[in-house]
């Protein structure tokens, strides 16, 4: 059995690390470069960096910040935000990322997934999915709808069907973020995560809602996720990554332990 991963997420706005709740009220909490280095030194398995307003503002990602983060860490590094073309992907990979995460750009142009996979390999292509629970309908039979542009635009697309499409187009991984749970620290949306994990054969990262080691354990067991994305739980000093790994491992999950 492969070890499950613990992945800190850096939401970056104007070059600064921020955090909000349900995609609102983001506050400045520090320097993303220093924070990434600290998480790397603590034993994070991977770092995810999102330029959270790049798509909404219709601009490119802050490549200088990506380069600075990449120079400080020596673990897999995934970068997303404002990636709309294969050239955008190339620029992020050249800046030092191992993976690119496409979200709004893939919803608007699904071919970017297959184009990116052909150019760089499926292992480099992550599709980020921002999802909100809605009333079930013919268009949204699962009751989970895809939302883009930082939670601003509902797309009338069913999240489970979109996950299957992404896998078919060549995505190597899915990062499934529940807008309803984001930043609440009340636990992951396990029903959503499990439905998607059961619908695809590629790795699924659970995102949104981590508030305790038990929440993370639930995501990688009951939720079927291969990794747990975390933010508030470590950004505000509630836990360190070694704390989390020790407690989750003690519950019976297989993790890569801190050296």
Swiss-Prot record:
One of its GO terms (biological process) is L-histidine biosynthetic process. GO terms for cellular component: cytoplasm. It holds the Pfam family His_biosynth. GO terms for molecular function: imidazoleglycerol-phosphate synthase activity; lyase activity. The active site is at 11, 130. CDD domains: HisF. IGPS catalyzes the conversion of PRFAR and glutamine to IGP, AICAR and glutamate. The HisF subunit catalyzes the cyclization activity that produces IGP and AICAR from PRFAR using the ammonia provided by the HisH subunit. NCBIfam families: hisF. Heterodimer of HisH and HisF. Belongs to the HisA/HisF family. This is Imidazole glycerol phosphate synthase subunit HisF. It comes from Nitratidesulfovibrio vulgaris (strain DSM 19637 / Miyazaki F). The lineage of its organism: Bacteria, Pseudomonadati, Thermodesulfobacteriota, Desulfovibrionia, Desulfovibrionales. The gene is hisF.
């Amino acid at each position: 059995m492969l070890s499950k991963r613990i992945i800190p997420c850096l939401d970056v706005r104007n070059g600064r690390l921020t955090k909000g709740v349900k995609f609102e009220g983001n506050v400045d909490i520090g320097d993303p470069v220093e924070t990434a280095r600290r998480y790397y030194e603590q034993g994070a398995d991977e770092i995810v960096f999102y330029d959270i307003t790049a798509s909404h503002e219709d601009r490119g990602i802050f490549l200088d910040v990506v380069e600075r983060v990449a120079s400080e860490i020596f673990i897999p590094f995934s970068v997303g935000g404002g990636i709309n073309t294969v050239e955008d992907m190339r620029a992020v990979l050249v800046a030092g990322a191992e993976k690119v995460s496409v979200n709004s750009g893939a919803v608007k142009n699904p071919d970017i997934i297959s184009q990116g996979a052909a150019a760089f390999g499926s292992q480099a292509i992550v599709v980020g999915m921002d999802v909100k629970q809605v009333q079930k309908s013919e268009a949204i039979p699962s009751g989970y709808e895809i939302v883009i542009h930082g939670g601003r635009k509902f797309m009338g697309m069913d999240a489970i069907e979109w996950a299957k499409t992404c896998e078919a187009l060549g995505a190597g991984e899915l990062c499934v973020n529940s807008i309803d749970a984001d930043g609440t620290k009340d636990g992951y949306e396990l029903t959503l995560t499990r439905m998607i994990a059961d619908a695809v054969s590629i790795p699924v990262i659970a995102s949104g809602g981590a508030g305790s080691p038990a929440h993370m354990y639930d995501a990688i067991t009951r939720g079927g996720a291969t990794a747990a994305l975390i933010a508030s739980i470590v950004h505000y000093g509630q836990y360190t990554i070694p704390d989390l790994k020790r407690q989750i491992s003690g519950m019976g999950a297989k993790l890569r332990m801190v050296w």
